[in-house]
Amino acid sequence: GVLGTVKNLLIGAGKSAAQSVLKTLSCKLSNDC
């Protein structure tokens, strides 16, 4: 259904956003940007 599709899109967007935040944090913490 539509709700399931929207939910999957939000989950996918959240995962990719979280991954980029984690990458930024780890590179700043290790001074390896």
From Swiss-Prot:
UniProt KW Secreted keyword: yes
GO CC annotation, single: extracellular region
Alphabetically ordered keywords of this record: Antibiotic, Antimicrobial, Secreted
Tissue expression per record: Expressed by the skin glands.
Subcellular location per the Swiss-Prot or TrEMBL entry: Secreted
Keyword Secreted: yes
A Pfam family annotated for this UniProt entry: Antimicrobial_2
Biological process according to GO: defense response to Gram-negative bacterium; defense response to Gram-positive bacterium; killing of cells of another organism
InterPro entries with a match to the protein in the record: Antimicrobial_frog_2 (IPR012521)
Function: Antimicrobial peptide active against the Gram-positive bacterium S.aureus (MIC=25 uM) and against the Gram-negative bacteria E.coli (MIC=6 uM). Has no antifungal activity against C.albicans. Shows hemolytic activity against human erythrocytes only at high concentrations (LC(50)=180 uM).
Family: Belongs to the frog skin active peptide (FSAP) family. Brevinin subfamily.
Annotated protein name in UniProt: Brevinin-2GRb
Organism: Odorrana grahami
